[in-house]
Amino acid sequence: MSRILKRIAAGVVIAGVAALLLAAGGYAAGARVNTTKSIPVGLYWTSSAPVEKGAYVLFCPPQLGVFDDAKERGYIGAGFCQGGYGYMMKRVLAAKDDAVAVADDGVRVNGELLPLSAPIKADKAGRPLPRYQSNSYTLGNSEVLLMSDVSATSFDGRYFGPINRSQIKTVIRPVITW
């Protein structure tokens, strides 16, 4: 190998190691990147803010069949949560004492139809999607409904229903989104 190629290879290795260290340091400091359509794509920072309506959150899905199927079908990734699920990012759109109803036209919270919330009957491969069944359910103290308000095709609460607050790992705040 020529001297120039050795220098180029060394430079590439050094740049790669530096990029990995920078990414690991950013993650340890609280940086999170969203590449899904469930919330705006971009860079987020973890926060100690309370979980409340309107907040973006990072959560581990509970070990339920609906999430096993979602992982198997590729709706959610593999990761380090129980059940081998990856973290998910959504927005809290309903919390304690909110009445939630799911119908063909979408999800209603306290009677108001959420935008982009109509359940889809089948995925792109033609497989039937699950659907949370509720004509009206009032969320308890420890329950939240996590949804997308920017995508009509997000795998969210319209399919899996409310989750327990204990599944939420942190609130995340947008830094740069596009």
Swiss-Prot record:
Its main location: periplasm. GO terms for molecular function: serine-type endopeptidase activity. SUPFAM superfamilies: LexA/Signal peptidase (SSF51306). GO terms for biological process: signal peptide processing. One of its GO terms (cellular component) is periplasmic space. Keywords: Conjugation, Periplasm, Plasmid, Signal. Required for donor-specific phage sensitivity. May be involved in pilus assembly. This is Plasmid transfer protein TraF. It comes from Escherichia coli. The gene is traF.
